[in-house]
Amino acid sequence: MSHGHRVVVIGGGIAGLTTALSLIADSPSPIHVTLLEAKDTVGGIIRTSPFAGLPAVDEAADAFLVRVPHAQQLATELGLGAAITAPTGAHASVWHNGMHDIPADLLLGVPAKARAFARSTLFSPYGKVRAAVEPLLPRTTDNDSIGHFVRRRFGREVHERLVDPLVGSIYAADTDSFSMEAVPQLSALTAERSMLLAAGRARAAAAKNSQPGAPIFGTPLRGMGALIETLSQRVTALGASIILNARVHSVTKSGHQYTIHTDGKDYEADAIVVASPARHSAPFLRDLDTHAGQLLADWTHASVVLITLAIPATQWPAHLTGSGYLVPKPDQRWVTAASFGSNKWAHWRPADGSMIVRVSLGRDGLDVMHFDDDKLLNLALADMKLHLGVDLQPNHVRISRWAESFPQYRPHHFARLAEVEQSLGLRAPGVVFAGASYRGIGIPACVQQARTASTATLHFLSAL
């Protein structure tokens, strides 16, 4: 790259920002990076704001997975490593006609030891026996629907009361329609005949390779928004341009050059990293490749509402010392999960002793976006009264709407993505993807995709 090549990154979530950082930091020669973000702020669905007298309470993701190193490494690179704190270790529950502790020794809901599972109050005697015979069953080969696979291996109760609530709460998903491949921790277990035995070995290996008591999750003390703020500052300090309110409506190609058209200005590029959601990317990619654009347009996204409450200390039941609870789909009305934030995070404890509670409503197949704020609050409080047996009256309320923000990885998602990339590779070389719509939804996965996209882009530019 003898001259300054131009790269446009479309999308200012953590994947787009990390891509921009990596492009500048890793390029062996001058490079001009422009990041275009359609909204008036960067961060995607990572957002942190003051609440109930606390300086920083997250409005979406409140942590990242530490044992998958990519997000932790990024935080350290940005100088935030010392500011990462871990949850308190308070235990979570499942509400199924009452509260039940989530059994120990699970891997995303999959039992790793039969003994702890057998002691759980969450399952009927039949459900326990059905799960216990899993190692004796013949191998299951059709493995690209989480729900179908887990039911075949462990029976209905383990799927409905453990795996679906746990995975569904992360991805806002219906696991009957969600790809096993999209959840690497589970997908790895399908390579062996017994999922239970494989889960046990995976947990033992993870324990062996980590320090005793090492946290599974971490978050900056100033909230996940601190990661975005520091990252965007680093990107601009290194010379990249971040353009807000720059919605891309089309991309055209002339020779080896691309032109990215926004409402306000056109941008020239030698390569493009698409780090925007598939539903936003499909329209502007159709100009480059009709087939790829149509495939992306067919991908679905779920909507979630997160209601944050501050409950006066005098109202909060003293016995509720856990980190929150999940609601299995057959038991759901509107609330899918509730997190008792002040129990989960030591730095989320207001001076007046209030309990910070975050309540999730909506998922794939359960739309709540049409309700107004008052209705949503009433639905949340009514469900919590059923679950907790107490009529809560919050003194602070915040409602965060995340419309079509959770990509739904249907079975065979990665085969369709490969088809998109193969088609684009022929018609639009130098266009690559990164972000939650493509190869993983969690923050570490988005960071990893960004690093990979940067490497691929620099390799492409080196041949021009």
Which stretches of residues belong to each language-model region?
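Mid-domain catalytic core of redox enzymes
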Residues: 2, 244-357, 363-374, 386-387
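N-terminal Rossmann-like FAD-binding beta1-loop-alpha1 element of flavoenzymes
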Residues: 5-35
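Dinucleotide-binding Rossmann-like beta1-alpha1 core, especially the glycine-rich loop
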Residues: 52-138
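Active-site/ligand-binding neighborhood in enzyme catalytic cores
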Residues: 129-249
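Conserved flavin/dinucleotide-binding core of flavoenzymes
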Residues: 48, 103-111, 319-321, 336-464
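Conserved Rossmann-like nucleotide-cofactor binding loop
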Residues: 15, 41, 279
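Glycine-rich FAD pyrophosphate-binding loop
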Residues: 24-52
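Short, well-ordered coil/turn residues at beta-beta hairpins
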Residues: 67, 152-153, 169, 275-276, ...
